[in-house]
From Swiss-Prot:
Pathway: Protein modification; protein ubiquitination. Non-enzymatic covalent modifications of reactive cysteines by electrophile metabolites inactivate the BCR(KEAP1) complex. One of its GO terms (cellular component) is cytoplasm. One of its GO terms (biological process) is regulation of autophagy. It is found in: Cytoplasm; Nucleus. It comes from Danio rerio. Kelch repeats lie at residues 292-337, 338-388, 389-435, 436-482, 484-529, 530-576. This is Kelch-like ECH-associated protein 1B. It comes from the Eukaryota. Ubiquitin ligase activity of the BCR(KEAP1) complex is inhibited by oxidative stress and electrophile metabolites such as sulforaphane. Electrophile metabolites react with reactive cysteine residues in keap1 and trigger non-enzymatic covalent modifications of these cysteine residues, leading to inactivate the ubiquitin ligase activity of the BCR(KEAP1) complex. Substrate-specific adapter of a BCR (BTB-CUL3-RBX1) E3 ubiquitin ligase complex that regulates the response to oxidative stress by targeting nfe2l2/nrf2 for ubiquitination. Keap1 acts as a key sensor of oxidative and electrophilic stress: in normal conditions, the BCR(KEAP1) complex mediates ubiquitination and degradation of nfe2l2/nrf2, a transcription factor regulating expression of many cytoprotective genes. The gene is keap1b. One of its GO terms (molecular function) is ubiquitin-like ligase-substrate adaptor activity. The record marks 119, 241, 399 as: Sensor for electrophilic agents. Keap1 contains reactive cysteine residues that act as sensors for endogenously produced and exogenously encountered small molecules, which react with sulfhydryl groups and modify the cysteine sensors, leading to impair ability of the BCR(KEAP1) complex to ubiquitinate target proteins.
Length: 587
């Protein structure tokens, strides 16, 4: 049945009523008839004589000027603005393939077009030439669906040439997100040095480690070594070399033939890193994959196995795969996008057991896997990461308070003891700046501590640094910029809300704005230049609140609440999980 709309308007002042009738299918039916007339060469008033090049054989297309003008601003201008084509029965057209013009004419009559891998570039070129935006959009959507590591650079280049901003942006985003795969494809090696420098300078590059960018640049140079040798220094300056490890740099200096200038540049960076010289803050790669705050384990009447993630941008929480064994007093950290849960204790109805386990969570599949065990159980442990290795610091096993420290190498899945701290510490806070590991506060079995010490991995030795103004165990500790922030904790009498900041260059402590709530055994991390503290214990209650510190304004804001109150939680930041079957938390 033919669809229509009818509307009766109220009587006008003259007493007449108006009946409005719209036949919805009329336009499509009219164009279908016009298309029949075109195919039968009836009532046509123009012939387009199309050939791609002047020497090619032409192909004639008969059509109606009004239909062409209705679908293309170029044809409309051609036939209505007093141009010579207005009075021509045969209009010569060059620069577009006849098959493409045939498809565009067909679209003008039918509003339908088919594109495939072999023809989409030609059709899109033609649609851009004749400003047929709906066809351009269809081709753009098709090409976005076809993006893969082998063609993304070519599609981005094509989009830039024809001025298709949307396609160019989406292709570039694909390249940034999949840089490591794109960098192995033939198209990557056809980039000019200027294009490559621009690409690797982008903050949005999604790489697990800066070594991936370094290796990509070396491979690009090796592809045509003699021609590309002059560009090595420009590439190295664009790579964030201060994010590389000294061991990696040493291997590259030994195994690759560098020119004198590049060798000196890399050697200087190696010296800066191994001498732990303060450097300007290195801008982090910030891929457009959302970075979430993960909370693992914790204590609320008993140890918990929860893994949850908070998105500070949306305010949403996700419930993820639980730990296999509940743990509190654990620590968390991230290496190459993987979340590690270290040590802790299982406080349960059947008793308490300190843990020497290390578990690794992969956001790509929402799964945990066990890793090599530490040499001893460590409850209320502190951890830090230097050169892609985890340092497990202090903690306790029963009545034993550790000063021992061990280091985990993910590539070998093995632990190695390093020099012990000068002081036994449980409830210790740990942070890393300039490849130096800082252990702050804690409890030695007798006293809460204000002391702090610093570990040098090159020398494998600890040294004392300035003590805090306040004794604290179970404080939240993190590095932000060139400062170490210490938040809350327990002084032996009260839970604290005070905050101290350590200046690594001046070896001195000063107070910052206090938190809104007193907290010990809290979780802490940094996210986009701000500090987040989560949960903890205030002396009476297990807290579910989350506060955020802005160093620019020296102020705290309460931003959200966890699903339930808890203390002794491990907290770290990594990418949003890719697993789709996730459970939103009902907070």
């Amino acid at each position: 049945m033919t669809e229509c709309k009818a509307e009766v308007t109220p009587s006008a002042s003259n007493g007449h009523r108006v009946f409005s009738y719209t036949l919805e299918s009329h336009t499509a039916a009219a164009f279908a008839i016009m298309n029949e007339l075109r195919r039968e060469r009836q009532l046509c008033d123009v012939t387009l004589r199309v050939r791609y090049c002047p020497l090619d054989t032409h192909v004639d297309f008969v059509a109606h000027k009004v239909v062409l003008a209705s679908s293309s601003p170029v044809f409309r201008a051609m036939f209505t603005n007093g141009l010579k084509e207005c009075g021509m029965e045969v209009v010569p057209i060059e620069g577009i393939h006849p098959k493409v013009m045939g498809r565009l004419i067909e679209f003008a009559y039918t509003a339908s077009i088919s594109v495939g891998e072999k023809c989409v570039i030609h059709v899109m070129n033609g649609a851009v030439m004749y400003q047929i935006d709906s066809v351009v959009q269809a081709c753009c959507d098709f090409l976005v669906e076809q993006l893969d590591p082998s063609n993304a650079i070519g599609i981005a280049s094509f989009a830039e040439q024809i001025g298709c901003t949307e396609l160019h942006q989406k292709a570039r985003e694909y390249i940034y997100m999949n840089f490591s795969q794109v960098a192995t494809q033939e198209e990557f090696f056809t980039l000019s040095h200027c294009q490559l420098v621009t690409l690797i300078s982008r903050d949005e590059l999604n790489v697990r480690c800066e070594s991936e960018v370094f290796h990509a640049c070396v491979a690009w140079v090796q592809y045509d070594r003699e021609e590309r040798r002059p560009y090595v220094q420009a590439l190295l300056q664009a790579v964030r070399c201060h994010s590389l490890t000294p061991h990696f740099l040493q291997r590259q200096l030994e195994h690759f033939e560098w020119d004198a200038q590049s060798k000196d540049y890399l050697s200087q960076i190696f010296r800066d890193l191994t001498l732990h010289k303060p450097t300007k803050v290195i801008p982090l790669r910030t891929p457009k994959v959302p970075q979430l705050i993960y909370t693992v384990g914790g204590y609320f009447r008993q140890s918990l196995s929860f893994l949850e993630a908070f998105n500070p941008c949306s305010g949403a929480w996700l419930r993820l795969a639980d730990l296999q064994v509940p743990r509190s007093g654990l620590a968390a950290c991230v290496i190459s996008g993987l979340l590690y849960a270290v040590g802790g204790r299982n406080n349960g109805p059947d008793g308490n057991m300190d843990s020497h386990t290390l578990d690794c969570y992969n956001p790509m599949n929402n799964c945990w896997r066990p890793c090599a065990h530490m040499s001893v159980p460590r409850n209320r442990i502190g951890v830090g990461v230097i050169d892609g290795m985890i340092y497990a610091v202090g903690g306790s096993h029963g009545c034993t308070h550790h000063n021992s420290v061990e280091r985990y190498d993910p590539e070998r899945d093995s632990w190695q003891l390093v020099s012990p701290m000068l002081t036994r510490r449980i409830g210790v806070g740990v942070a890393v700046i300039n490849r130096l590991l800082y252990a702050v506060g804690g409890f030695d079995g007798t006293h809460r501590l204000s002391s702090a010490e610093c570990y040098n991995p090159e020398r494998d030795e600890w040294r004392s640094i300035a003590a805090m103004n306040t004794v604290r165990s179970g404080a939240g500790v993190c590095a932000l910029g060139n400062y170490i922030y210490v938040m809350g904790g327990y002084d032996g009498t009260n839970q604290l809300n005070t905050v101290e900041r350590y200046d690594v260059e001046k070896d001195s402590w000063s107070f910052s704005a206090s938190m809104r709530h007193r907290r010990s055994a809290l979780g802490v991390t940094t996210h986009h230049g701000r500090i987040y503290v989560l949960g903890g214990y205030d002396g009476n209650t297990f807290l579910d609140s989350v506060e955020c510190f802005d160093p620019e304004t020296d102020s705290w804001t309460e931003v959200t609440h966890m699903k339930s109150g808890r203390s002794g939680v491990g907290v770290a930041v990594t990418m949003e999980p890719c697993h789709k079957e996730l459970i939103p938390c009902q907070c």
